[in-house]
């Protein structure tokens, strides 16, 4: 994947405005609410019985922060995403057996949350850059499956 200087600048400048814990928790919470079949991977997280329970669940928030922190790592390694996510790809493929489509779904929800939080800062160019990032991360996570 080739990243332009403008894309790198947009990603970096907007990332600086992001509260990783807050946005990560919301994105993962939305994944579990909007796509309830993904809850099976989080059965040990306790109460996932409703949207309110999911979005208020401290384990969902903590794991969302962890997931979103990895998006930050991606920004540091844009030219080497496959290597950066190799161990996570192996974990999700070999141990957790996560369908790769779920990576794309989460990426789309990250974009939804960023748009809601960043308002006018999340321009069409910024959306395109984050979409490219989300797709690239999903592709890197799916690498072990091929």
From Swiss-Prot:
CDD domains: Hb-beta-like. This is Hemoglobin subunit beta-1. The keyword Metal-binding applies. The gene is HBB1. Sphenodon Hbs have properties not found in other reptiles: poor cooperativity, high affinity for oxygen, small Bohr and haldane effects, appreciable phosphate effects (those properties are also found in the Hbs of primitive urodele and caecilian amphibians). It comes from Sphenodon punctatus (Tuatara). It comes from the Eukaryota. SUPFAM superfamilies: Globin-like. The lineage of its organism: Eukaryota, Metazoa, Chordata, Craniata, Vertebrata. Involved in oxygen transport from the lung to the various peripheral tissues.
């Amino acid at each position: 994947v080739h990243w332009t200087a403008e894309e790198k600048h947009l990603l970096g400048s907007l990332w600086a405005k992001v509260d990783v814990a807050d946005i990560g928790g919301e994105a993962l919470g939305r994944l579990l609410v909007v796509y309830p079949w993904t809850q099976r991977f989080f059965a040990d997280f306790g109460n996932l019985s409703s949207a309110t329970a999911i979005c208020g669940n401290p384990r969902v928030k903590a794991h969302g922060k962890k997931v979103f922190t990895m998006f930050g790592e991606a920004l540091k390694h844009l030219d080497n995403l496959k290597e950066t996510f190799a161990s996570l790809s192996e974990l999700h493929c070999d141990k957790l057996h996560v369908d790769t489509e779920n990576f794309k779904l989460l990426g789309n929800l990250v974009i939804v949350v960023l748009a809601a939080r960043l308002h006018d800062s999340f321009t069409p160019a910024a959306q395109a850059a984050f979409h490219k990032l989300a797709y690239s991360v999903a592709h890197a996570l799916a690498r072990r499956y091929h």
